[in-house]
């Protein structure tokens, strides 16, 4: 990812700690055991352990739990520029089952951004690098700063 900052092209910095804390305090994420690990402009990462309470009736990770992990990352990456962004569409593909005890790590990257919309790709992988799910997601970007939200 290119950085157009005036500091000579250095790697992008993480978002400010106040924004990170607000994104990390998502009540559903907390309930599901999802931990936001990193957020910087155009990138976010979170992880979730597939615990017994997150299994479906056939003993694999519930699709809703996996989708929630993708959505938490989508929210973080799309709000990483400091203004409020709201989801318009999230298309998810489930590629392989998450297994009991798996640590699923989801990473989201910015694909395209304008003043009003943005598109993100999010992938969730197990600790053995197995691709569990992927999403392509779009947001509407508001002018409202997170500080005022």
Q: What label would you give each PLM region?
A:
Residues 2-14, 98-103, 109-149:
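HotDog/MaoC-like acyl-thioester-processing domains
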Residues 30-32, 42-44, 84-90, 102-104, ...:
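A generic structural signal for short beta-strands and their flanking turns/coil linkers
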Residues 48-50, 94, 141:
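Hydrophobic residues in beta-strands and at strand termini
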Residues 75-105, 110:
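Hydrophobic beta-strand-centered segment that forms part of the acyl-chain substrate-binding groove
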Residues 1-47, 51:
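Non-catalytic linker/capping segments at the edges of enzyme domains
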Residues 59, 82-83, 129:
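Detector for glycine-centered tight turns/loop "hinges" at secondary-structure junctions
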């Amino acid at each position: 990812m290119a950085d157009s900052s005036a500091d000579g092209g250095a790697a992008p910095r993480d978002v400010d700690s106040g924004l990170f804390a607000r994104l990390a305090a998502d009540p559903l994420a907390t309930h599901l055991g999802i931990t936001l690990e990193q957020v910087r402009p155009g990138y976010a990462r979170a992880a979730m352990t597939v615990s017994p309470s997150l299994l479906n009736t056939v003993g694999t990770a519930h699709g809703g739990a996996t989708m929630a992990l993708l959505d938490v990352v989508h929210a973080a990456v799309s709000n990483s520029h400091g203004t409020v962004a709201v989801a318009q569409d999230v298309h998810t593909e489930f590629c392989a089952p998450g297994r009991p005890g798996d640590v699923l790590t989801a990473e989201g990257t910015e694909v395209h951004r304008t003043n009003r919309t943005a598109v993100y790709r999010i992938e969730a992988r197990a600790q053995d690098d197995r691709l569990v799910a992927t999403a392509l997601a779009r947001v509407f970007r508001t002018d409202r700063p997170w500080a005022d939200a």
